[in-house]
């Protein structure tokens, strides 16, 4: 009996042990998975905290840039005051110069009529005594020295004013360059912050467990990625604008160099022709005194030389005309060739005029031929086919209602300037233009000046119409932007301490415009 009971107890123990071991193993496995998940969540939280720290560091850099910008703008304000003071000094100096101008001119005329040495002699000879003579000489010396000092002082004052103006302009250019660099740096920081926002939302999406929260985070991630892509596209367009500006500058320098070389070649050719013509004329005059046979031979030689020179002159004139039509203005290339004799001048002018007339006639004939060919081309009229009335199409991309843009911009007259501001609580120049276009068209033209250069077609300031953008600075390195009102006016957020207002190109002239 006891043995049977003992066997039953042992059998039960074995059975319980067999069942409990898998349960314990499963519990241990769950604990391990929970620990792993906790570790993963902790790692994600650490990564998210690190990303947040980087974002905060970048925000600190943006704040530092804001401070630097404020310092630069304060310096600009100081420079404007110094410039105003300098203008007043120049005005006062000019008034003093005008008051003394009559006296200086009178003394200059007297000095030309009577030289100083004779005046001194007259003073001595007409003196009543030796003391009188000495007094007169001293008085004349004092007057002459005073006049010389006066002229010298005026000269020194003018030089000092010019030096101050040059220094002031250099400082203003330096500040403009610094502002352009700040705009570029602001764009880089925005791009980095967008990248970090993508990282942060990605980590948050991995950490989220609830589907609704995860979906919301994924949406934010998609928005951040879209913002990242937009800023990268803006950076690409900005780089493209910089490269295009550099290419245009290189092409302009090449054209100017070619024009300078052409002008130099023409000048050398004209000088050579003048020298040879003068030598030929002088030689003919001297040889006319020789015997008849010698005169005949030398005259023949002179005529041949003159004919060759005139041909060279005509060729040079033709080349100069061709160069003028392609690259160089007329005023910078045309030079008159002086002649020492009537015959050489008449011959040269005749050849030049003939070449010019021939070139003009050829151009006219070609133009007439082209016009005739164009007029002879007849395009058959297409057969009209009835079509249903189309539905009104939206404005194409790049076509903007200028009146609507201007009306929206006028709503924010008086809004204070805030560097980096992008809403009606405060605008900077590019934030103002971006906000206005976003409200009217729903289009984001970029958060700083350089991407906004690529928002349309580059045109001259005189071609700008209402609603177009006006830029200050070179393409790819602009530092200010405004909205054109037409008629030489624009609306912009100017600088700290001022509000959104209307300005005029007469007082603050932009460098180029972009047609929207």
Swiss-Prot record:
Q: Where is the active site?
A: 429 (nucleophile), 480 (proton acceptor), 492
Low complexity composition bias: which ranges? 237-247, 257-380
List every stretch annotated Disordered. 208-397
Q: What is the annotated signal peptide range for this record? A: 1-27
Entry GO CC: extracellular region
Q: Which GO terms describe its biological process?
A: proteolysis
- Database matches in PROSITE patterns: NLPC_P60
Q: Which residues form the NlpC/P60 domain?
A: 399-516
Location comes to:
Secreted, Cell wall
UniProt keywords, alphabetically: Cell wall, Hydrolase, Protease, Secreted, Signal, Thiol protease
Pro residues bias located where?
A: 381-395
Q: Which PANTHER family match?
A: MUREIN DD-ENDOPEPTIDASE MEPH-RELATED (PTHR47053:SF1)
Protein name listed in UniProt = Protein P54
Annotated organism of origin: Enterococcus faecium (Streptococcus faecium)
């Amino acid at each position: 009996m006891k043995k049977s009971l003992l066997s039953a107890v042992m059998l039960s123990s074995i059975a319980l042990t067999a069942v409990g071991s898998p349960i314990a193993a499963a519990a241990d496995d769950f604990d391990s998975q929970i620990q792993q998940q906790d570790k993963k969540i902790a790692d994600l939280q650490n990564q998210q905290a690190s990303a947040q720290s980087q974002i905060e560091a970048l925000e600190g850099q943006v704040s530092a840039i804001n401070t630097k910008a404020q310092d630069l703008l304060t310096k600009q304000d100081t420079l404007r005051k110094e410039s105003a003071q300098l203008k007043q000094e120049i005005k006062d100096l000019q008034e003093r110069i005008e008051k003394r101008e009559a006296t200086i001119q009178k003394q200059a005329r007297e000095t030309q009529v009577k030289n100083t040495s004779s005046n001194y002699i007259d003073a001595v000879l007409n003196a009543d005594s030796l003391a009188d003579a000495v007094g007169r000489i001293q008085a004349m010396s004092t007057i002459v020295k005073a006049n010389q000092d006066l002229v010298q002082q005026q000269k020194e004052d003018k030089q000092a004013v010019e030096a101050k103006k040059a220094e002031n302009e250099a400082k203003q250019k330096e500040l403009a360059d610094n502002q352009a660099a700040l705009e570029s740096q602001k764009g880089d920081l925005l791009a980095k912050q967008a990248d970090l926002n993508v990282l942060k939302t990605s980590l948050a999406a991995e950490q989220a467990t609830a589907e609704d929260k995860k979906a919301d985070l994924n949406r934010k991630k998609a928005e951040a990625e879209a913002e990242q892509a937009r800023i990268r596209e803006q950076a690409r367009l900005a780089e493209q604008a910089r490269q295009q500006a550099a290419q245009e500058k290189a092409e302009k320098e090449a054209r100017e160099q070619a024009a300078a070389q052409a002008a130099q070649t023409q000048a050398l050719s004209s000088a050579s022709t003048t020298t040879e013509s003068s030598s030929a004329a002088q030689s003919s005059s001297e040889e006319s005194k020789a015997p008849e046979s010698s005169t005949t031979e030398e005259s023949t030689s002179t005529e041949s030389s003159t004919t060759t020179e005139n041909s060279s002159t005509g060729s040079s004139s033709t080349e100069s005309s061709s160069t003028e039509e392609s690259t160089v203005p007329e005023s910078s290339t045309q030079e008159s060739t002086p002649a020492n004799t009537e015959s050489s001048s008449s011959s040269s002018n005749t050849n030049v005029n003939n070449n010019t007339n021939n070139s003009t006639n050829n151009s006219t004939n070609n133009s007439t031929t082209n016009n005739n060919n164009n007029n002879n081309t007849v395009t058959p009229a297409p057969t009209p086919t009835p079509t249903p009335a189309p539905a009104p199409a939206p404005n194409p991309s790049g076509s903007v209602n200028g009146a609507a843009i201007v009306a929206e911009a006028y709503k924010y007259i008086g809004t204070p300037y805030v560097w980096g501001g992008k809403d009606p609580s405060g605008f900077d120049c590019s934030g103002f233009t971006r906000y206005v276009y976003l409200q009217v068209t729903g289009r984001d033209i970029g958060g700083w000046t350089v991407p906004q250069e690529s928002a349309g077609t580059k045109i001259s300031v005189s071609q700008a119409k209402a609603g177009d953008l006006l830029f200050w600075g070179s393409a790819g390195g602009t530092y200010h932007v405004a909205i054109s009102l037409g008629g030489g006016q624009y609306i912009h957020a100017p600088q700290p301490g001022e509000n959104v207002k209307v300005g005029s190109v007469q007082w603050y002239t932009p460098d180029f415009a972009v047609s929207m």
